[in-house]
Structure formats: structure tokens, C-alpha cells
Amino acid sequence: THQGAEWVDGSDAWLGEMWPNNEERKREIIRDFDLVADWSQRHNIRILLGEFGAYSKAPQDSRVRWTAFVREQAEAHGFAWAYWEFGSGFGVYDPNVKVWREDLLKALIP
């Protein structure tokens, strides 16, 4: 999710990598969400997924698929969520041309 991020050393090596959107990778995310949900239930503490997103240098279709799946899992597990962020490198809005990144917006708000 940080492909080509200027503040992450070596992240240019990840440029162009696609999130495979296969069952194995989905199970990894589901497993992590299940662990958090179990902890949440045992301790009676609600969860806010306070930050998730994929940097704009990653392939857009991969960003959209990953974002949609993470959002879907957060909602399926009863977690509130907040996308990182509105209008910069991860943004769902492009302030330079004043347009929504529609595919990413639909991944968040279908």
C-alpha cells in the first residue's frame, strides 16, 4: 500500500505490484480481522479501523480492489472505519483537477 512512497526507503522496488485479489490473500486479511473481532468481543471494546489506504503510485485497479475488500471486511466485522485520506497521495479526491476518483469512491461508498 506504500508503493513508491517517498518516505519509505526501498518502496520503488514495489512499484507495479498488483494485489492478487485471490482467496489466499483474502483469507490473510479475514484472519487478521477475525483476530481483532475476537479480541473486541472478549473485551467489549468497539473497533475503529482508523486508517487504511493505498498510495496513488500503486496500480489504480489494484488499489480499488484492495480498498473495497478491506472496507467490506471492516463492515462485515462490525468495525467503524476511516479512509486515509481525502485529497493527497492516497486520496479519494483529486484537488488539482477538482474531481473525485470515482472508482475509489465507489470502493468506499458503493
Regions found by a protein language model. Give the residues of each.
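Substrate-binding clefts and catalytic carboxylate motifs of secreted carbohydrate-active enzymes
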Residues: 1-110
